Amino acid sequence: MEKNLSSRDDDALHSLSASSSYDSVYDLLHYHERGNGLTINGKPSYSIEDAGEQITRDNVSWNGSNVFGKSANLTFKFLQSARSTPDGDTGFVKFNAAQVSQAKLALQSWADLANVTFTEVTGNQSANVTFGNYTRDSSGRLDYGTQAYAYLPGSGSASGTTWYNYNVDNIRSPDKMEYGRETLTHEIGHALGLNHPGDYNAGEGNPSYNDVSYAEDTRQFSIMSYWSEKNTGGDFNGHYAAAPMLDDIAAIQRLYGANMTTRTGDSVYGFNSNTDRDFYTATSSSKALIFSVWDAGGNDTFDLSGYSNNQRINLNEGSLSDVGGLKGNVSIAHGVTIENAIGGSGNDLLIGNGADNVLRGGAGLDPRFSDRCR
């Protein structure tokens, strides 16, 4: 447990007994402990590393089979025509402007994490990753079933292709925090070599969270999962992640290595963000955040000052935080140090990580705990 206690003001300390303060800190520090032989929801709990291996269990990337930590320079393409998908679906529709824009943001979110670059090609040029829509199933009927699918890397003609059901509203009009953007990021994950965390697929039987291989197979930990974050105690209030989550970061870095050029300066996440990433940027108190941070260096800050909710903010790597009225919606990847945090106008709990933390509670009664805190 963190040893030294300091506070924004004495009132915060007087308002909470020492016992209740430390109980609150203990609860947050041990918020969804995982791995180490634990069982959660009757399922084995996997560490972040074990989950990353599970999500990449086919051990394939654009570098071949059983090649790990090697960079890849990839191409992508928005198809202009197709007779049918590899599954036989028909009624091709090319990506519209909104889909193109959101797909490029989704590609960027993967490239930030690992040593993967994406270059767009057009015309008759072949590409590693392709995008297209379909509207009808193999029998020619309008398809309202499977919403999207993709193929892992390989040498076949289907490899790296991603397909989307244009009959679905939020597939046609994807946006941050909604299902359409999440779907783009998910399918690109497949095209890069990531599996679902468990052996299930849409349209094959009736799988549920009861069938998962390990407890953390939820959207709280992986954008590749089908299952609600509520199964592991999170609550995104109906929103979806736009970018890879905690276990996805471990997975993609296992295949291609960690991108150590990403945000090496002093980065701000949340309000007043300078990351140039929509999913790391809070624009108003009514807009939610859902993200896992990958950051390669600098003196970095979580600025959550615009929220009035009571927040629990933990700066330790691998941790979960409750931000902006959601639960377990912000996490920090292994190997990442976030030095500073700014709370909002609610009663926030802030926990540092042993770096030279600056923890500012804002308004409200805000106990702060860190090994070294200013």
Segment roles from a protein language model:
Residues 1-95:
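Disordered inhibitory propeptide/activation segment of secreted metzincin zinc metalloprotease zymogens
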Residues 29-71, 98-220, 226-235, 284-288, ...:
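Metzincin-family zinc-dependent endopeptidase catalytic domain
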Residues 271-274, 312-337:
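Acidic/polar low-complexity surface segments
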Residues 297, 306-308, 317, 342-347, ...:
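Extracellular, beta-strand-rich repeat scaffolds characterized by small/acidic residue-biased motifs
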